[in-house]
């Protein structure tokens, strides 16, 4: 990992990961300048990374942000291992792979990151939040989303990864089955008054935390807000109040 990038990171206790759903680096960096790295992390997905590349990730990290590189690597073991190493070299905080790539692929990814003193969290994707039982059936999987999530998440844990991406509806089940140290990253987070958009299995921030989620990926409620930092702070305040009641 680039030591200059690592030194520039601002550690945050907020579980919020803001999804940078922008088409290019200019838009993403302009938006990031309106946020505080002490109050959130950022997610860079396939569209943005494909258009802007490693330089964007390094620029965000140099500004103090911890970056989740959401590329969902899914290929032969050696290719995924090398991709994960490249992600670590760019200074990311978290990177993910598809659990459906299987044991050898996930173990190769884990081993590729083992030598880094500041190793990124390695997370696996189970079932995409846009998918329902009918979608799984069309690709030959005779299981409910919950059943398939548990199967893939168990395999992920057995391969030594840090956690999974899952919907909040599966969080309680996974915490019970796989333990509290197994991290759950939850997309599909919406505020109570937000439209569901294209993610079917959605939940509010505090409900997701109550269910067992560790990190909350939030996009439109923050990126489309007139004042993104104010929206982020309102969410963090709600989370702080909720967590205070739990302690």
Curated annotation (Swiss-Prot):
One of its GO terms (molecular function) is orotidine-5'-phosphate decarboxylase activity. The active site is at residue 72. Its EC number is 4.1.1.23. Substrate binds at residues 21, 43, 70-79, 129, 190, 199, 219-220. InterPro entries: Aldolase_TIM, OMPdecase, OMPdecase_AS, OMPdecase_bac, OMPdeCOase_dom, RibuloseP-bd_barrel. The keyword Amino-acid biosynthesis does not apply. GO terms for biological process: 'de novo' pyrimidine nucleobase biosynthetic process; 'de novo' UMP biosynthetic process. Catalyzes the decarboxylation of orotidine 5'-monophosphate (OMP) to uridine 5'-monophosphate (UMP). Belongs to the OMP decarboxylase family. Type 1 subfamily. This is Orotidine 5'-phosphate decarboxylase. The gene is pyrF.
């Amino acid at each position: 990992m680039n030591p200059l990038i690592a030194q520039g990171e601002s550690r945050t206790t907020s579980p919020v990961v803001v999804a940078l759903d922008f088409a290019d680096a200019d838009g993403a960096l302009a938006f990031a300048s309106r946020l505080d790295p002490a109050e959130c992390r950022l997610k860079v997905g396939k569209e943005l990374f494909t258009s802007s590349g490693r330089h964007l990730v390094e620029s965000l990290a140099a500004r103090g942000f911890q970056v989740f590189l959401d590329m969902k690597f899914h290929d032969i073991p050696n290719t995924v291992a090398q991709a994960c190493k490249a992600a670590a070299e760019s200074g990311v905080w978290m990177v993910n792979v598809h659990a459906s790539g299987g044991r050898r692929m996930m173990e190769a990814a884990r081993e590729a990151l083992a030598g880094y003193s500041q190793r990124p969290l390695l997370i696996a994707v189970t079932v995409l939040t846009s998918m329902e039982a009918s979608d799984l059936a069309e690709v030959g999987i005779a299981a409910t989303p919950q059943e398939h999530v548990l199967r893939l998440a168990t395999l992920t844990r057995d391969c030594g990864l840090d956690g999974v991406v899952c919907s909040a509806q599966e969080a309680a089940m996974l915490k019970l089955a796989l333990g509290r140290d197994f991290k759950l990253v939850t997309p599909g987070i919406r505020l109570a008054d937000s439209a569901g958009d294209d993610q079917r299995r959605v939940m509010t921030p505090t409900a997701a935390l109550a269910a067992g989620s560790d990190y909350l990926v939030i996009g439109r409620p923050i990126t489309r807000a007139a004042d993104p930092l104010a929206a982020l702070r309102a969410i963090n305040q709600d989370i702080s109040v909720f967590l205070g009641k739990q302690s």
